[in-house]
């Protein structure tokens, strides 16, 4: 089997094209059914997010795999094959492995190092598995990719420093309070930036989100989405007297919160008020920063943090690329030795059959012996067998990485007259389950490998 991926993302296609190529959860069953109806496709995983759609397949042939996936996407989206070729990118074989490792690590995302994509890769794999669309090689690939994504984040910390204004605002709020779990926040505005901010606040466990917007209907809709409270725009100053945090992002051409009016309502506050203004033009009067127990941060201060963090992420991305290269080599080494696995399975099977046959003869000749003596004989046979097989198996795996690997495999098969079933030396397969099965507990003498 050969690995092929065809994808579209925010860099290659506009949103009106990406939305046609997206897959909702309830569409996946039909999508996989269509893909797997092609004789050349043995397995598939579909990764579909806001900014990307990628179709991974295990195909009998690279060129056929590319052709099939493009045809499938064209039919799905109602686009021409020419459009699909223009808007998509593709990777095959180990380039596809390298690409998925980068995707899972957040290095191919719109926001460098973002964390959400790793969960999306995991979900895509689990959905494909639950629908029985994936196969052995795709299972191994995605499991490895998820491990790589975790390793990159653990060893580099690339996801720690915020590189979006909304996330930076919430991180700043966390630095004020330590925890948001007993805090109330007022969001002024109900647009995209406020929505992102609300998601981050919810993630960090904010006690309550209050939203004010000039359109009260939109404020109510926003509040329902985040389990918050909507208030009329005219009530902003009343709310300012009770909240701990204000994050404002409207499209107003003038100030929303003025120093004189705020001063009138916060006189009896016993705790500080933090205001973060991420609007351009500004929503909050900069003179407010002069009030006692009031702390104001504007978008320029946040942008400085974001710029600095983005530069840091770029440095960490270089470390991440090194990790990915190391993991890619490990994957290639694993895959390059897979053609010897059926031979190893056959060797173990034949050796086990000989062991069991000779043990039966020996135990029959020994007659009535104790269970302890029987176990000693079985253990001896088991140890001799393992020690005899260990070196040939290790050497064969080593030779598999050389140009003579197939020759050594054939020599071993001939020397031991092995019957190797379903051997496909150059295929992109993963017969690990067969190895595990051969290593299971043996019925005779209660031995296990």
From Swiss-Prot:
Residues 427-449 are annotated as: Disordered. Keywords: NADP, Oxidoreductase, Porphyrin biosynthesis. The record marks 99 as: Important for activity. Substrate binds at residues 49-52, 109, 114-116, 120. It is an enzyme of class 1 (oxidoreductase). GO terms for molecular function: glutamyl-tRNA reductase activity; NADP binding. The active site is at 50 (nucleophile). GO terms for biological process: protoporphyrinogen IX biosynthetic process from glutamate. It catalyses: (S)-4-amino-5-oxopentanoate + tRNA(Glu) + NADP(+) = L-glutamyl-tRNA(Glu) + NADPH + H(+). CDD domains: NAD_bind_Glutamyl_tRNA_reduct. Its EC number is 1.2.1.70. Pfam families: GlutR_dimer, GlutR_N, Shikimate_DH. Pathway: Porphyrin-containing compound metabolism; protoporphyrin-IX biosynthesis; 5-aminolevulinate from L-glutamyl-tRNA(Glu): step 1/2. NADP(+) binds at residues 189-194. Catalyzes the NADPH-dependent reduction of glutamyl-tRNA(Glu) to glutamate 1-semialdehyde (GSA). Homodimer. During catalysis, the active site Cys acts as a nucleophile attacking the alpha-carbonyl group of tRNA-bound glutamate with the formation of a thioester intermediate between enzyme and glutamate, and the concomitant release of tRNA(Glu). The thioester intermediate is finally reduced by direct hydride transfer from NADPH, to form the product GSA. Possesses an unusual extended V-shaped dimeric structure with each monomer consisting of three distinct domains arranged along a curved 'spinal' alpha-helix. The N-terminal catalytic domain specifically recognizes the glutamate moiety of the substrate. The second domain is the NADPH-binding domain, and the third C-terminal domain is responsible for dimerization. Belongs to the glutamyl-tRNA reductase family. This is Glutamyl-tRNA reductase. It comes from Carboxydothermus hydrogenoformans (strain ATCC BAA-161 / DSM 6008 / Z-2901). The lineage of its organism: Bacteria, Bacillati, Bacillota, Clostridia, Thermoanaerobacterales. The gene is hemA.
């Amino acid at each position: 089997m050969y690995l092929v991926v065809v994808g579209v993302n925010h860099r290659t296609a506009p949103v009106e094209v990406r939305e046609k190529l997206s897959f909702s959860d309830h569409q996946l069953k039909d999508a996989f059914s269509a893909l797997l109806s092609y004789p050349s496709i043995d397995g598939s995983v579909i990764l579909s997010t806001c900014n990307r759609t990628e179709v991974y397949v295990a195909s009998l042939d690279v060129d056929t795999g590319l052709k099939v996936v493009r045809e499938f996407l064209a039919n799905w989206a109602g686009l021409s094959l020419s459009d699909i070729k223009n808007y998509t990118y593709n990777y095959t074989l180990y380039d596809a492995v390298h690409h998925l490792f980068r995707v899972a690590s957040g290095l191919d995302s719109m926001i460098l190092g973002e964390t959400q994509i790793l969960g999306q890769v995991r979900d895509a794999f689990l959905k494909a598995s639950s629908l029985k669309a994936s196969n052995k090689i795709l299972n191994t690939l995605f499991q490895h990719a998820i491990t790589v994504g975790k390793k990159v984040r653990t060893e580099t910390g690339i996801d720690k420093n915020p590189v979006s204004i909304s996330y930076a605002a919430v991180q700043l709020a966390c630095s004020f309070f330590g925890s948001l779990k007993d805090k109330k926040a007022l969001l002024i505005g109900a647009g995209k930036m406020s929505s992102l901010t609300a998601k981050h606040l919810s993630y960090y466990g904010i006690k309550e989100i209050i939203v004010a917007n000039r359109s009260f209907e939109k404020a109510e809709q926003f509040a329902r989405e985040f389990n918050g409270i909507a208030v009329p725009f005219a009530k902003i100053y009343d709310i300012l007297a009770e909240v701990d945090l204000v994050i404002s992002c409207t499209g107003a051409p003038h100030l929303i919160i003025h120093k004189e009016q705020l001063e009138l309502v916060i006189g009896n506050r016993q705790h500080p008020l933090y205001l973060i203004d991420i609007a351009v033009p500004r929503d909050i009067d900069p003179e407010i920063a002069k009030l006692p127990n009031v702390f104001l941060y504007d978008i320029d201060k946040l942008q400085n943090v974001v710029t600095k963090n983005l530069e840091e992420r770029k440095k960490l991305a270089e470390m991440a690329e090194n990790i990915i290269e190391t993991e890619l080599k490990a994957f290639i080494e694993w895959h390059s030795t897979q053609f010897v696995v059926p031979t190893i399975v056959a060797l173990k099977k034949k050796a086990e059959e000989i062991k069991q046959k000779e043990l039966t003869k020996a135990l029959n000749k020994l007659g009535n012996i104790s269970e302890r003596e029987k176990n000693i004989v079985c253990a001896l046979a088991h140890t001799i067998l393992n020690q005899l097989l260990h070196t040939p198996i290790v050497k064969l795996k080593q030779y598999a990485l050389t140009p003579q690997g197939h020759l050594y495999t054939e020599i071993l098969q001939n020397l031991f007259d092995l019957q190797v079933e379903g051997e496909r030396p150059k295929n992109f397969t993963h017969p690990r389950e067969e190895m595990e099965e051969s290593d299971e507990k043996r019925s005779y003498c209660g031995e296990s490998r």
